[in-house]
């Protein structure tokens, strides 16, 4: 059955100090949910507060976006943390986002992991379990966005969390439904028209479309457009326009 609504999310608030990442203000005119970096892979208190403030003014839902403490690698390198350490770095970042969202007059309403930490939840159940432990310890009522078909999606639901299943508009998928490594050619989709058409097909069919065109059925609640690419704003605009043209309403989940 064709989905009647979909959430459109983006990873934002990733600038820090003198370094600027993406065009957050433009993206916040398009997306319905913003995953805000918490200072470990990107972001700092000034950027976080400003992102929450603009999101509040534009009516965009916000979530914490914890990652590995790796500013120079942008959180895209796997780091050798134990599950117990992962629990603490996730709890720390959720708390920072909650505090600065409240400070900025907004409310943080979900959590989504970033980069290498998020990718590990596809393949490593111990990492997924650690993230669920952290969320339940900090706020058992906090929903999570989890990569569709991942261990985090499964374990989160098994342990009673509200889980929003996420696919990606601008990333290629392997034949088993995992994200193609960014080290591989074609892992990131830069053609906005192609990305938008594929996003509509996936949501209409309730399935991930792999690099060969195979469709893998899955629940889909939200779709991500990354905010740090040169084409991000164009891709986001065309994805949203594609949904609306197909009769799929774009609305926040929280």
From Swiss-Prot:
Listed CDD domains: LamB_YcsF_like (cd10787)
UniProt-listed Enzyme Commission number(s): 3.5.2.9
SUPFAM superfamilies to which the protein is assigned, alphabetical: Glycoside hydrolase/deacetylase
One GO MF term: 5-oxoprolinase (ATP-hydrolyzing) activity
One Pfam family, short name: LamB_YcsF
Group of enzyme by EC: hydrolase
Gene Ontology biological-process annotations: carbohydrate metabolic process
Reaction equation(s) it catalyzes: 5-oxo-L-proline + ATP + 2 H2O = L-glutamate + ADP + phosphate + H(+)
Gene3D superfamilies attached to this UniProt entry: Glycoside hydrolase/deacetylase
Highest taxon listed in the record's lineage: Bacteria
Keyword hit for Nucleotide-binding: yes
Keyword Hydrolase tagged: yes
Keywords for the protein's UniProt record, in alphabetical order: ATP-binding, Hydrolase, Nucleotide-binding
Similarity section: Belongs to the LamB/PxpA family.
Quaternary state and interactors: Forms a complex composed of PxpA, PxpB and PxpC.
Role noted for this protein: Catalyzes the cleavage of 5-oxoproline to form L-glutamate coupled to the hydrolysis of ATP to ADP and inorganic phosphate.
Protein name per Swiss-Prot or TrEMBL: 5-oxoprolinase subunit A
């Amino acid at each position: 059955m064709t989905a009647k609504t979909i959430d459109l999310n983006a990873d934002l608030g990733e600038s820090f100090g003198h370094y600027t990442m993406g065009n957050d203000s433009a993206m916040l005119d398009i997306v319905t949910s913003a995953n805000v970096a918490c200072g470990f892979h990107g972001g700092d208190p000034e950027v976080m507060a400003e992102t929450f403030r603009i999101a509040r003014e534009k009516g965009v839902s916000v979530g914490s976006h914890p990652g590995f403490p790796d500013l120079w690698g942008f959180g895209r390198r796997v780091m050798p943390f134990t599950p117990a350490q992962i629990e603490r770095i996730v709890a720390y970042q959720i708390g920072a986002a909650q505090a600065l969202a409240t400070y900025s007059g907004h409310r943080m309403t979900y959590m989504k992991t970033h980069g290498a930490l998020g990718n590990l939840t596809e393949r490593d159940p111990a990492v997924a379990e650690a993230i669920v432990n952290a969320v339940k310890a900090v706020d058992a009522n906090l929903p999570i966005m989890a990569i569709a078909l991942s261990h985090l999606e499964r374990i989160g639901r098994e342990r009673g969390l509200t889980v929003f299943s996420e696919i990606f508009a601008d990333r290629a998928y392997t034949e088993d439904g995992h994200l193609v490594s960014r080290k591989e050619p074609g892992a990131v989709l830069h053609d906005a028209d192609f990305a938008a058409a594929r996003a509509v097909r996936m949501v209409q069919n309730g399935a991930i479309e792999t690099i060969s065109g195979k469709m893998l059925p899955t629940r889909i609640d939200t779709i991500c457009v990354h905010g740090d690419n040169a084409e991000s704003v164009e891709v986001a605009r065309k994805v949203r326009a594609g949904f609306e043209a197909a009769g799929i309403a774009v609305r926040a989940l929280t």
